[in-house]
Amino acid sequence: LFLLSRFQELDLKSLQDARGAKMFATISEIANTWKIANDEMLDFDEIEREDFLLGHCLKSISLRLESDQYIDFSLMIRKTVEALESDNNEINSALSETKHLMVDEYQDVNISQERLINGLYKRMESVFVVGDDDQAIYGWRGADVRNIVEFDQRHRNCSVHTLSTNFRSTETIVSASDRFIQLELSTARINKSPQAHSNGNIQQFGNFWFNTRIEEANWITTRINDLIGIK
């Protein structure tokens, strides 16, 4: 809504005309680029040198957000990282009483979030991260699974605690999933041997392959209807 309501003022019309795109396609492009630029801490001046109109629009958005006193999540992290890395006295004072940092879902951390964590950790006594590299599914939005896979290499004196018991699934599902992930990722994953808490009662387990996502979705829908008795 911010971009839509200020489409002309932010000079997005020039970007639209240059791309030969529709209005909402232009908004989608600039919104995605804005988030990626902040998530990866990219310099708007460098973007402008590569793509003048795109960089110009990003700068316009940044200035307008500040003047209108708005902020989004990606910019919030970016501004905090910049403050932490500038060794701001106010930041140091605000964090002086905080000794320990805990990060959950660490496998999904992106570049700016990792720099945020590092900036905070430098002012604290310890950092405790929790995550599962096998559940890293957000690479498409900038998450870097190497953050957790290589954590013990960056922090040589850290201790690693493995939670290998799975309370959610049966042994058949756990072992099959582990074998599949091992085949896909091999040495690119943290070495682990997950075990199920209980074997449970398996009615049916199988591997299915589909040529398209539509074919897969149709099969799942039909299977669900069969299981609940809908013809």
Predicted regions span which residues?
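Short helix/loop segment immediately N-terminal to the Walker
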Residues: 15-19, 86-97, 190-197, 229-231
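Conserved helicase NTPase motor core
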Residues: 48-150, 162-169
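Conserved P-loop NTPase-based nucleic-acid remodeling module centered on helicase motor cores
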Residues: 1-25, 149, 222
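Generic hydrophobic alpha-helical segments
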Residues: 3, 61, 80, 84-87, ...
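Alpha-helical scaffold elements adjacent to nucleotide-binding pockets in ATP/GTP-utilizing enzyme cores
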Residues: 2-6, 116-119, 147-154, 172-180, ...
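Phosphate/oxyanion-binding loops and surfaces in catalytic or ligand/nucleic-acid-binding neighborhoods
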Residues: 6-10, 30-40, 127, 154, ...
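Helicase P-loop NTPase motor core
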Residues: 156-159, 165-231
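Charged, alpha-helix-enriched surfaces in structured cytosolic catalytic cores
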Residues: 2, 25, 71, 143-146, ...
